[in-house]
Amino acid sequence: MTAPAPAPVLHASERPELTAHGLGKSYGRRAVVRGVDFTVRPGEIVALFGPNGAGKTTTFYMLVGFIRPGRGRITLGERDVTRLPMHERARLGLGYLPQEPSAFRKLTARDNLLAILEYQNLPRAEQEARADALLAEFGLTHLSHSYAYQLSGGERRRLELARALTTDPDYLLLDEPFTGVDPKSIREIQRLIRELRDRRGIGVFITDHNVRETIALTDRVYLMFDGEVKFEGTPQEFGADEDARRHYLGDDFEL
């Protein structure tokens, strides 16, 4: 029997940069996001933190394509994607994993992957080979015929990550990936996300309130409050920054 063939993998140097240029969003007279700039580079993991009301979620949803910016641009390499809908962004290389469960509950783990792969212009045998390769990569081969509703929170999250890779994205946008996941599964998901960066060269952009679990992964951190980016730097610099402690982390925070 022939081993499943993995999808072609691009090195980080072959992938475009994802950049936000002066993003702004207002609702009536209330400015929620004001002139936000950030960059996610291929092969790095970047976190966006912020207290409630900081504009973090609005910024993240502008990147995903749920909310249209009032000002500014979003580019993927030299391509302006600001006004493109979510499915067009996905086609260009922006993958998205929502906070809410997104696996099809009444499909098996394998069929969850095939349901997405069927939309790609691939022979059926290659679709099945890619599905099996992803199941193996994410430690789900033994659950390939289990229905999604039968999986634990950690298993389901791994399936959703695998499904996000069926489109061979350049970037994955992860919304609260550690919510509802037990500590052991969190460590496994952290390992898998690192492998996406290290082995596939994928850029990962995370927003999550689980600061310690997220910061353990990240290469760089952005912090928002009052609708603006107030900090950008390494996790170590973030943990030591006075403004970050005052507005978000608290004085007793330790890495």
Regions found by a protein language model. Give the residues of each.
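Conserved ABC ATPase signature
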Residues: 147-151, 155
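ABC ATPase NBD coupling module
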Residues: 80-100, 124-128, 144, 238-242
